[in-house]
């Protein structure tokens, strides 16, 4: 049963966060001349404004999962196999904003079934993994800078994770062996969120968050492009990646989930 060097993987995950954090702050440096129409100037809201954003997420999954009874195993779902392995992947976000202050909520649910071959010499030939992951973030933000069509917020909060995995071995001397386990943990995360209005109806946004707590590492990064096709409602497309490294009493969840997202947001 193969195990991955957790320190090396943790370092690689940490490096994934840096480009996204830079992207979130870098939206401020986009030249206004790039837009054919002058972008709107942000006006601090005097009353509460609410934004609701449901998405579909074509998330691939890659990393180590394990239980005390089965040991730690590697699983992956490449983008080309998402249609086969991904059962459900949805997420929704909400924001309430007044002036420079904002309240944020983010919910995510992913259900996957992966099938991977095991290396020569392993006691089984194939491994099937049923994985369900639920993640919820609740936090707040404060606007650090507003200039023209750009805004940069500092963001922080608490993320709660729930993961349930079942491992089934096929072939070899342990054909039919299986094990399942579940865990819940809580992390604190912080980072930056940025927006830049390319035109009055087209907007680029990004965020990068990282932290930890009960897990060794918790991170989340995304870049989105939105088009307001009618006042108050926008179509959104982009890419999101998030990961966590949690280990406790033989339970291992050291996984990166990433892929394109497509959805809408409504502002009220």
What are these regions (language model features)?
Residues 1-47:
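Cleavable N-terminal export/targeting peptides
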Residues 33-106, 267:
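Short glycine/proline- and aromatic-enriched beta-strand/turn motifs that initiate or cap beta-hairpins
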Residues 52-54, 92-98, 138-142, 156-158, ...:
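Residues on the lipid-exposed face of transmembrane beta-strands in outer-membrane beta-barrel proteins
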Residues 61-87, 107-135, 161-185, 213, ...:
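Extracellular/periplasm-exposed beta-strand and loop segments of Gram-negative cell-envelope proteins
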Residues 84, 148, 209-220:
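Solvent-exposed loop/turn segments connecting transmembrane beta-strands
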Residues 100-105, 147-150, 200-204, 232-235:
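Repeated loop/turn-to-beta-strand initiation elements of outer-membrane beta-barrel proteins
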Residues 202-216, 241-242:
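Transmembrane beta-strand segments that form the barrel wall of outer-membrane beta-barrel proteins
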Residues 217-267:
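Predominantly the C-terminal beta-signal and adjacent terminal strand-loop region
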């Amino acid at each position: 049963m193969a195990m991955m060097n957790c320190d090396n993987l943790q370092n690689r995950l940490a490096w994934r966060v840096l480009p996204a954090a830079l992207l979130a702050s870098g939206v401020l440096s986009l030249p206004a001349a790039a837009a054919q129409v002058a972008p709107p100037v942000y006006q601090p809201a005097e009353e509460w404004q609410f934004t609701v954003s449901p998405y579909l997420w074509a998330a691939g999954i890659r990393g180590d999962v394990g239980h005390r009874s089965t040991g730690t195993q590697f699983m992956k779902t490449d983008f080309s196999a998402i249609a086969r392995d991904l059962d459900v992947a949805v997420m929704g976000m909400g924001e309430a904003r007044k002036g420079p202050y904002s309240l944020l909520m983010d919910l995510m649910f992913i259900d996957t079934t992966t099938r991977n071959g095991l290396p020569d010499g392993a006691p089984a030939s194939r491994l099937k993994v049923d994985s369900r992951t639920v993640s919820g973030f609740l936090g707040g933000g404060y606007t650090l800078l507003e200039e023209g069509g750009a805004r940069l917020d500092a963001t922080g909060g608490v993320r709660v994770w729930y993961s349930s995995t079942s491992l089934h071995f096929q072939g070899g001397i342990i054909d039919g062996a299986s094990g399942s386990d579940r865990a819940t943990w809580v992390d604190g995360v912080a980072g930056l969120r940025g927006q830049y209005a390319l035109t009055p109806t087209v907007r680029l946004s990004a965020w990068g968050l990282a932290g930890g707590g009960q897990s060794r590492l918790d991170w989340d990064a995304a870049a989105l492009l939105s088009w307001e096709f009618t006042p108050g409602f926008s179509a959104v497309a982009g890419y999101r990646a998030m990961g966590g490294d949690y280990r406790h009493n033989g339970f291992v969840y050291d996984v990166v989930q990433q892929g394109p997202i497509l959805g809408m947001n409504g502002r009220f």
